[in-house]
Amino acid sequence: MSHAVKIYDTCIGCTQCVRACPLDVLEMVPWDGCKASQIASSPRTEDCVGCKRCETACPTDFLSIRVYLGDETTRSMGLAY
C-alpha cells in the first residue's frame, strides 16, 4: 500500500530524509528556495511503507516532510488521523 508523502517548502535541503529512507522513495531535486539549492522529492511514493523514518530524520522544527498513512493502514494500526 502506498502512502502520501508531502514535502513542504520549509525543507532546508539537508538530505537527511533521503538518507533515512530504507526504500529509496525520496530523492533530491534542484530548487532555488533554500541555501542548499535542492529540495526533497518523492517520485516513488508507491514504494512507501509508512515507517516515517524520513520524518524522524528531519532536523527542522517544522517537519518539512510528512508521511500520511493510507486509511487501511491507520485502521489496522488502530490510529485515528
Curated annotation (Swiss-Prot):
It catalyses: reduced [plastocyanin] + hnu + oxidized [2Fe-2S]-[ferredoxin] = oxidized [plastocyanin] + reduced [2Fe-2S]-[ferredoxin]. One of its GO terms (biological process) is photosynthetic electron transport in photosystem I. Binds 2 [4Fe-4S] clusters. Cluster 2 is most probably the spectroscopically characterized electron acceptor FA and cluster 1 is most probably FB. PROSITE patterns: 4FE4S_FER_1 (PS00198), 4FE4S_FER_2 (PS51379). The keyword Iron applies. Its EC number is 1.97.1.12. It comes from the Bacteria. Its cofactor is [4Fe-4S] cluster. One of its GO terms (cellular component) is plasma membrane-derived thylakoid membrane. [4Fe-4S] cluster 1 binds at C11, C14, C17, C58. InterPro entries: 4Fe4S_Fe-S-bd, 4Fe4S_Fe_S_CS, PSI_iron-sulfur_center, PSI_PsaC. NCBIfam families: PS_I_psaC (TIGR03048). Apoprotein for the two 4Fe-4S centers FA and FB of photosystem I (PSI); essential for photochemical activity. FB is the terminal electron acceptor of PSI, donating electrons to ferredoxin. The C-terminus interacts with PsaA/B/D and helps assemble the protein into the PSI complex. Required for binding of PsaD and PsaE to PSI. PSI is a plastocyanin/cytochrome c6-ferredoxin oxidoreductase, converting photonic excitation into a charge separation, which transfers an electron from the donor P700 chlorophyll pair to the spectroscopically characterized acceptors A0, A1, FX, FA and FB in turn. HAMAP family: PSI_PsaC (MF_01303). This is Photosystem I iron-sulfur center. It comes from Prochlorococcus marinus (strain NATL2A).
